Amino acid sequence: MTSEPRKSRGPFTPALFIASIMTAVNIQLLLLAGMCYLYGTASHQASRYSNLEILAISLDDGDIGTALTLASSQFDGRYHLPTVKIGSSQDYPDLDSIRNSVCKADYWAAVVINSGSSDRIYGIWNGSMSTVEYDPAAAATYIYNQARHPNIADSILLPGINALVKATTESFYGSSNARSALMNLNTSNVLLPAIKTYLNPIGTTADLIQPTPQLNRSFYNTYEIGLLFHGITGCPCLSMSVYIYAYRESWNVDGAVFCKSWMLYWLLMDIHWQVMETLIACYIPMQFSPFFVFPWIITNVASTVFPYEIMPAWYKIGYALPSSGVYTLNIHIWSGCGSQLGVALPALFVWWALGHITSVFAVRKRCSDSAKEPWSSSDST
């Protein structure tokens, strides 16, 4: 008994050619739309730097504290710099209270004129204090959480802080006490130290919340968020946590942080899996799955790449996405600081709960649809 020869494929028909072209065009449009959405997060970003607020506090009752207040009025949203808000020493009596305010994300950063700064400068000028006793960096302290969007913190907040300190110095030069003190110098043993102090009266000391100096920090809210789609078990999450921990360099995180991040990444992978399980091959045909998966990845990455304060208002829908909640929780795990937990935790719980509930119905629907499909003649013989 001879088998029937297999039929060769038909010619490349015009219909097949048109279908191939349409698929290629649709894929290109999908990529274009996705990347436009991602690039839109940085559109005219500099015009929104003023939405980042820096708290300015003077614990000094002298001229430097007054100069800070005068200089802060220049930072009102102009010049593509963060906005400076003047705080009261009654509300923030010490560095701990100011640091706590930044930790809670009430402000992105803080600049503090330390107590006694003016007296120390005038002590140099009148000869009652030696230059050995004076450190310009002790005049002011700046605070920000470097674990919270570190690239933005270093590229936007730090230049804003430096600009504020420079403006404070210029304002201090113009004070009547500073001018008269310098003009009244009359002894050579005081003149040289006084000039040195006059040229550099106000320096800064950094008091960073969770210093994050490693350069691979740029991947934490970009590449890593997109990579969390590549697995659904604890092993990929573990490997991700391992290489982040292994390349932490001088980053001060311990084993507890490592384990918490591992569990958090696992939660996010589980949410992504439940979303795919519910929709793909159930409500979205398999051939159209790229038109859902790619936008889902892009919108999740876009929700973490920049702070919402400097993105167009439309992107605030990212608060509802799971990746945004995971990055918010990661900041809290890494630094112990950050607000918006009241948004991140409920959002993640809703995604997780709904995903597990709807995936059950999705499986039932697929089984029901499969039972309704007739067997082909080739399979039934």
What are these regions (language model features)?
Residues 204, 237-242:
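Structural signal for the C-terminal ends of transmembrane alpha-helices
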Residues 31, 35, 230-239:
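Hydrophobic alpha-helical membrane segments, chiefly transmembrane helices and signal peptide h-regions
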Residues 2-215, 378-381:
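Extracytoplasmic/periplasmic domains immediately adjacent to an N-terminal transmembrane anchor
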Residues 214-231, 240-381:
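Membrane-spanning alpha-helical segments of multipass transporters and channels
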